[in-house]
Amino acid sequence: MIRIGSNSRAPRRALCLVTTALVVFGGSALAWADGAADEALKAGIGLLKQGKSKEADEKFRAVLAADPSNQDAYSLVKDTDYRVFLEMLKAGGDAEQVAKRLLNLSNQVEVEKSKDPAAIAALIDTAINAKELDQRDMAARKLAGSHGQYAVPGLVGYLGSNDVDTRANAILALTKIGSDAVLPLAASIGTGNEMQKQNTIKLLQRIGDERSEAAIAKAMGDKAGAAQKYMAMAKKYFHGDQMTVKAFDRSFSIWTVKDGALVARDVPRFVYNYELAEQCAYDALALDPSMKDARAMIALTGCAEQVAFGNLSDEARANEGIAAQGKALEGVGAIAGAVGAGGLLDAFRLGAELKNGDAAAKVADAIPGVWDGRAIGEDNALVQGLTSEDNKIRYAAAIALLRISPAAAFPKSNMVAQIAGDAAASRAVRQVLVIDTDTKNAMNVQRALNQAGFHAVAANAGTEGLSMAKATGGFDAVVVSSKLSDITVFQVLADLGRDFRTSGAKKIVMAAGGDLGASKAEYDKFGLSGVAPTSTDSVGVVNMVKEALASPAGDSGRVHANWLSIAASNAIAGANSPAFNLRDAQKGLLAAAGPGADPDVALAALNALAKVANGDAQSELRGIISTASNPAAIRVAACRAMATALRGQTPSKETYDALLDAMGDADVGVRTAAGAAIGSGKLTPEQQAEVMTKRRVD
């Protein structure tokens, strides 16, 4: 997600390279708006070099206002040293936005050119039929370099040719395309004649890419083995494994056979890995209709895509292709419901296994609607979720069980109400990802953040962390160790910064003593929100995360946390089962309704307290009732909760006085609710007389 007005800057040394753009950006490159945008861009770069970021941003905004076309941007990018754009991206602010906009527009032209059927057909004709080897070789190289996977449909048929030279030339061209050809080749098996099939299998075996193993097993008659391989790949795709989802930032096509022809279906990149996982699950299900994991994966991927769409910025959702994908995702609920309670429980378990708490929570939300009354044992996925280290999964499991409200106690049912109360108290709680290959330190930091009230999860490798971060784009902050064993911290920071799903997250680096040493200048390029010292208690990390995430109300993290709090409160209010001790939720509900809570959050918590409150809640409820600045609806709800808390009990003097005062409030609703609350308690005759006398209606 792009953030306008960032204060982060690249060092002056790095910006020196940007001055080369003053020469490279010729008037012919930016022809739109009669060269005005060209001049604005050059001026902006010059000002950026001088450290005048505010003035530079004004020029960059003028460039965006000129609304460059795809072709304008493509011409510019082709004629410019890419390092210029890299430094603009690092500079932040509107320099970063201009660079992202131009690169994105240019990329759209690149993609269209890579699919150009006329260009592909001409090169294939040369690669297959030219008499000279060097001509065939050059054409094959151009197919690989400029068209990649999109050349496969035109080449694959030649693998079944009766002419040995034709087959050899096709194999040569496809071999040069290499791993980019794997997905369309694997999808094509079964089309064409037997010779084409066998040559396709041999070619895929020669390339040796794991993504084709399931298709090869299927082609060789091993249905059971193929189904298992498809599911193994589905899990890797779902997790966003960087070594599996190849060309993740370039290619977003799902290959299938339709009416005997190999066709590509383009998808937005934010769902690409999930769509690959879903296709594998459908392939597995076609081989084994009884495969539970396949049905679970189909339900899970749909929910994961819905979550990912919800985490996009408004700007991203306005994109035509992304908006269309969002519209299509409206049908996910029907598919998820169709797998039934058992299928959704499997999907919830799978989401937890794959460390996608957001998708698992989305699945859990659908389970009560299809609940079939089955017995709940220790092996139930929701019961197992109650002890998950991921708070999202714990909270989702508790909320779902409350909504189900089983007729009898079940394993760990005594934990449910308190966990739900904790979920209610999690209003405006932020999501934090910890990346550290030191497993012990990662666990310590995760635990400390969770104890401090954050939702924290940990990854024990840089690549795993990037996959988790991109899975939903829902993390408010990423804490990464300065020392990783698989990739460098700079690779992690750069990838987080340039991906639209993660660019908005605050980035915090953990380093010994909080000192980045000689590398500080390099770190400064990535717009860090802070540096924290490593320690056994992780206090420094927690404090730095708190500082980085101190932001105003209304942001996406607060909205998500408030939604969770309201869902938990509503589940507690609606629960109706002897399996739960709902008063265990009281502490969390009181925290949810406390100072600083948004009105809808407080109202939901107070409505739940009207069902579960006891005398221990008097002090907090009294404070809400007595605060005149609280909205009348909140004070009324607090009075109703107080009525429950006082039922059959003697109110404290402070509570009695507060309710008596509230009976004289200007708002009739508050007066009425306060009267009902004071009447629910055990009053002395003297108190009863005082109420009647002091609040007499003349």
Locations of the language-model features?
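Structural detector for internal amphipathic alpha-helices that build alpha-solenoid repeat scaffolds
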Residues: 46-49, 62, 75-79, 103-115, ...
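Alpha-solenoid HEAT/Armadillo-like helical repeat scaffolds in large eukaryotic proteins
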Residues: 122-130, 154-162, 184-192, 218-222, ...
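Short hydrophobic/Thr-rich beta-strand motif most characteristic of the beta2 strand and flanking loop
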Residues: 453-461, 468
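Conserved phosphotransfer microenvironments
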Residues: 477-496, 503-504, 511-519
